[in-house]
Regions:
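Oxyanion-binding "anion nests"
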Residues: 243-244, 253-277
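Active-site nucleotide/adenylate-binding loops and adjacent lid/helix of ATP-dependent enzymes
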Residues: 114-200, 222-223
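Peripheral (often C-terminal) accessory segments that flank ATP-dependent C-N-forming ligase machineries
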Residues: 313, 317-402
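Flexible, glycine/charged-enriched surface loops at secondary-structure junctions
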Residues: 201, 274-276, 325-330
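Glycine-rich phosphate/pyrophosphate-binding beta-alpha loops
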Residues: 235-239, 243-247, 294-308
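Conserved metal-phosphate-binding beta-hairpin within the catalytic cores
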Residues: 266-302
Length: 402
């Protein structure tokens, strides 16, 4: 069946592949994706027209890529999604410059920059009564003569991620969990010594392993009303230096109070498009603490589609078909994983194993990278090879669970 839209995704990772799979499952369409390198889960896929483009996240390059596809399909609407933080501001900057047949479901640049800057986001959380970890904002030049209002362990992370990664150094991490104040001072010196200029976020470490984490994925319509909310209970994350915090295993769950609070926030700021919140349950006071908002679908987004709520369909019905839609807050249990089962059982606490096995026996589980309709043999073999490597990655980065 011919459709009047073309999906255009920017990026090359599992986020892109998961959304491309959602589009293919819902509409049978091939997705165009631009990535920087001839590698990753999109490269060689039968469901993706994968195009390599140098400096793919540069705003001018993004404009060129989007314009080319819009001209290639002049009678269709081009749905543009950025599948990484590095693409979001490039898209937002170009919203007024995109061709008329381009649909980019994003908020304006000013609001986006407020939300993705952690210091400004936490100020909004305080205004809306959204709990977050106890926080100290460190500004360049403060030196070591300051007091933290909470004991260790401590978390150190950049307030602004994009420019942080523009200044690499050997021990660079997405976030640091540190035991002593001396370690905090040393990491601060390393980060600013590499050339980073913005603020750092120093936080109270919320105790608990990966299984205390939650992810909340949402879709807000063009009218600013939330149409879909799905909470994922994270059972395991990745622990490599650059992958730390990436979800590896999730079971969907129902958290109505958390969803209601976040829905009110999203609708009040008139958010549109996909969003996801990283959250951790604090067993000390029984509260969910929000870490950050991403103004996009996360790399684990298929946990929502796999549970029966196809993200591509929500987007198309809103922005292309202009259909009304009532809010759906998901309730069913479903297992999502991107690592082999053996690795999952080795590193996830045993108290979750029974439900994991039950969901697998019921067929209520998915690994988004294994899609029957994607028949390219070489692509499948590369995915299998990468799955095998997870055993070594976890063995070198964390201890097995009890």
């Amino acid at each position: 069946m011919e459709h009047n839209f073309v999906p255009l995704l920017l990026g090359a990772d599992i986020n892109v592949y998961s959304m491309a799979r959602a589009f293919h499952e819902a509409y049978g369409v091939e997705t165009i994706a631009y990535g920087m390198y001839p590698s990753g889960p999109c490269y060689g896929s039968d469901i993706i027209d994968y195009r390599v483009r140098e400096n793919n996240d540069d705003p001018e390059v993004v404009l060129r890529s989007v314009t080319e596809v819009a001209q290639e399909f002049p009678t269709k609407q081009v749905l543009v999604l950025g599948c990484g933080d590095n693409y979001l501001t490039a898209i937002a900057e170009n919203l007024p410059r995109f061709p008329a047949n381009v649909v980019a479901p994003y908020i304006d640049l000013q609001l986006m920059e407020t939300l993705i800057h952690k210091e400004k986001f936490y100020e909004l959380c305080d205004r809306y009564g959204i709990d977050h970890p106890a926080t100290f904002v460190y500004k360049k030049g403060m030196g070591h003569d300051f007091e933290l209002p909470f004991p260790g362990p401590f978390v150190v992370k950049p307030a602004e991620s994009a420019t942080y990664w523009d200044h690499p150094f050997d021990t660079q991490k997405k976030a640091y969990v540190l035991q002593t104040r001396q370690e905090v001072d040393a990491v601060i010196d390393q980060i600013y010594g590499a050339g980073y200029e913005d603020a750092l976020i120093l936080q109270d470490f919320i105790p608990g392993d990966d299984s205390y984490m939650r992810v909340v994925t949402n879709y807000s319509g063009e009218d600013g009303k939330v149409r879909l909310m799905c909470v994922g209970h994270v059972l395991l994350e990745e622990h490599t230096r650059h992958g730390i915090g990436n979800h590896a295993v999730i079971i969907t769950e129902d958290e109505p109070a958390l969803c209601e609070q976040l829905r009110n926030f999203l609708e009040d700021i008139k958010f549109t498009g996909f969003s996801n919140f990283d959250v951790k349950f604090d067993q000390r006071d029984g509260k969910f603490k929000v870490f950050e908002i991403n103004c996009r679908q996360g790399r684990s987004n298929y946990y929502v589609t796999g549970a029966g709520y196809n993200l591509a369909r929500y987007l198309v019905e809103d922005r292309i078909e202009h259909k009304p839609c009532q809010l759906t807050v998901t309730k069913n249990r479903h297992l999502w994983r991107v690592i082999p089962a053996k690795v999952a059982y080795d590193y996830i606490p045993s108290r979750y194993h029974a439900e994991m096995r039950a969901l697998i026996e019921q067929g209520a589980w998915v690994n988004p990278l294994f899609y029957r309709a994607d028949r390219n043999l070489i692509h499948k073999l590369r995915i299998l090879r990468d799955q095998w490597r997870y055993k070594e990655r976890y063995a070198s980065s964390m201890e097995k669970a009890n």
